[in-house]
Amino acid sequence: MAQWNQLQQLDTRYLEQLHQLYSDSFPMELRQFLAPWIESQDWAFAASKESHATLVFHNLLGEIDQQYSRFLQESNVLYQHNLRRIKQFLQSTYLEKPMEIARIVARCLWEEGRLLQTAVAAAQQGGPASHPNAAVITEKQQMLEQHLQDVRKKVQDLEQKMKVVENLQDDFDFNYKTLKSQSDLSELNGNNQSVTRQKMQQLEQMLTALDQLRRTIISDLASLLSAMEYVQKNLTDEELADWKRRQQIACIGGPPNICLDRLENWITSLAESQLQTRQQIRKLEELQQKVSYKGDPIVQHRPMLEERIVELFRNLMKSAFVVERQPCMPMHPDRPLVIKTGVQFTNKVRLLVKFPELNYQLKIKVCIDKDSGEGAALRGSRKFNILGTNTKVMNMEESNNGSLSAEFKHLTLREQRCGNGGRANCDASLIVTEELHLITFETEVYHQGLKIDLETHSLPVVVISNICQMPNAWASILWYNMLTNNPKNVNFFTKPPIGTWDQVAEVLSWQFSSTTKRGLSIEQLTTLAEKLLGPGVNYSGCQITWAKFCKENMAGKGFSFWVWLDNLIDLVKKYMLALWNEGYIIGFISKERERALLSPKPPGTFLLRFSESSKEGGITFTWVEKDISGKTQIQSVEPYTKQQLNSMSFAEIIMGYKIMDATNILVSPLVYLYPDIPKEEAFGKYCRPESQEHQEPTDPGTAPYLRTMFICVTPTTCTLDLPMSPGTFDSVMQFPGEGSESGNGNQFETLTFDVDLPSECAASPM
């Protein structure tokens, strides 16, 4: 089915967008009348080659004539009238610039294809939510769209005035030359000069009208350029700047950035209007060369107008060249802007001016630290070479929406080795994870006689040589993008600015919400604030230095706040993601708050919190019980670290955990997850079900194997009567373990037993 026919079957919301694609410059009636022929032509090629554009344009006029003949046979007067009007408009507008109409048609066809793909994708996903324009348009953006429409209307109005002034000038030129030839003949024949004087007066009136119209056009052009400048400032200094800031926030775990498509449509529309206006200004030069006079406003103002429109277009093109996807290693998608030497990373650039004639015309080159040069050496920073495919041609085929982009998928960095191990200066004040580097993308655009150098940069990246440097490198990325929107401040960490707790708290919550389904609660953040700033009532506005966040050890600990927190984030992602998403892990809670929550609860109530003493990240559970006298006791088990969680899931540990009482009986102290969720309801679904089938001996005469399960046991007394091996007895006698957390209640050490189960009761919980 032809593309145009498919478009007619779309929902109303898509048809409204289709109507917005067409204007007087390429009427929708013509698209309807000649749909199959239009779709069969290579308009993008015509937009880049004038000879082919001329051929296609004349073929278009021929197709219009054939269609007109059909309407003539059908006696369809209305369609005849519309088609005749369209042909006259095309001839008067594009006969001398056929590449212009080719570019307009090519863009419309691209936009149609993108709209069709969007509609199909939305239908497959079950609704309009997947639509790229589904994002809410603010009142400010609605005003911006209105300003863009006003600009387009002014451009079209000027186009009509240009035709009027051209016709008036042609009439004046013809009458002037006619009068001049008649005057010369009259002088030779000695005829009466009164007729000549009368015609001279008519010419003067025509010249006055021509001058007035020229001045009106000059004034309108100046007003139009001011309107364009206003819209462009809104687009580049506000909308595009806002998008870049949102991209920064998204890079460090904040809300996902919005799609660039709407911004691309706005910028492309403005660029098209600017190019059309430039053609109008150049047309003024042609008119001036044909007819000029003393005080001609074209002579006075045209050079300034052309210089101004060219400058606007250059600046718009430069601003429209952006990094759509920041550098990122595929194995660490949640931590962009950190690159390890020798490991491939990807990034993507995009030009937000979607001209089909630029498809496969722009060759992008990528380099690193282009502007640093000797400055980097003075700072003592390392230097790198980019390996892999570091050049690529921008095209519209690789992207889903037909945008003009280039994606680099196979880039790696290699350090330039110096005599002192790559450091250009042994007095460097920054550690390697505080060094910031810029990846630069550059190209040249040749369009309608203009050469424009385009250059854009990634956000600053941190380059590491060992994956163990990742935590500190990511801390640098967080701190930078949290506190500045300067995209090129590579000296940021020579004097890192101070952050406030409000800023830090938001970013810390993002570290959880970006990789899980749950961020941090106010109570959890308050506990973290206490870890960073000490006891307090209100932490809002409290200042936090870079050193306190990442470099200095916490009070009484041998590690920094960030190292501790980053390991806990890793612990959650790798070992207890589902439990965190369910909200079962309180995690960050003070000892005092923990006791206050558990004390009024019935025995067996427990909660899950993170260890404060484990650098590598640990989690423990604390429960409430009653002693013989009925006094409330708060007990905690020694934290489980990644080493133990590699062997058994945390849910299985909780479900199987026992304590050994004074009579050597194994009992479970964990009954209800705080506040009152039965343990089996919370954790049972996350335990691996016992297989009903088990391997039997191949020899029929051999007794069946006994099945086994692992359970964690905490002894409460050292006078154990249960028969056990000497090794197990020695382990029990070593209780309590060294390095356990102190604080509220007793800290229990856990023993792991391999218990034999008869096959008939193997599936029964203990």
Swiss-Prot record:
UniProt-listed GO biological process terms: cell surface receptor signaling pathway via JAK-STAT; defense response; growth hormone receptor signaling pathway via JAK-STAT; interleukin-6-mediated signaling pathway; leptin-mediated signaling pathway; mesoderm formation; neural crest cell differentiation; positive regulation of DNA-templated transcription
InterPro entries assigned to the protein according to its UniProt record, in alphabetical order: p53-like_TF_DNA-bd_sf, SH2, SH2_dom_sf, STAT, STAT3_SH2, STAT_linker, STAT_N_sf, STAT_TF_alpha
Location(s), subcellular: Cytoplasm; Nucleus
SH2 domain: residues covered: 580-670
Keywords annotated in UniProt: Activator, Cytoplasm, Developmental protein, DNA-binding, Nucleus, Phosphoprotein, SH2 domain, Transcription, Transcription regulation
GO molecular function: DNA-binding transcription factor activity; DNA-binding transcription factor activity, RNA polymerase II-specific; protein homodimerization activity; protein kinase binding; RNA polymerase II cis-regulatory region sequence-specific DNA binding; sequence-specific DNA binding
GO cellular component: cytoplasm; nucleus; RNA polymerase II transcription regulator complex
A Pfam family per the record: STAT_alpha
Short sequence motif Essential for nuclear import: positions: 150-162
The keyword Transcription appears for this protein: yes
PTM (free text): Phosphorylation of both tyrosine and serine residues, together with dimerization, is required for mesoderm induction.
Modified residues (Phosphoserine): 725
Keyword Transcription regulation: yes
Complex formation: Forms a homodimer or a heterodimer with a related family member. Interacts with nlk.2.
Family: Belongs to the transcription factor STAT family.
Function: Transcription factor that binds to target promoter sequences and activates transcription upon il6st/gp130 stimulation. Mediates ventralization of embryos, at least in part via inhibition of smad2 signaling. Required for hairy2 to induce dll1/delta1 and promote neural crest cell proliferation and differentiation. Involved in TGFbeta-mediated mesoderm induction in early embryos, acting downstream of map3k7/tak1 and nlk.2.
Note: Involved in the gp130-mediated signaling pathway.
Protein name, entry field: Signal transducer and activator of transcription 3.2
Source organism of this protein record: Xenopus laevis
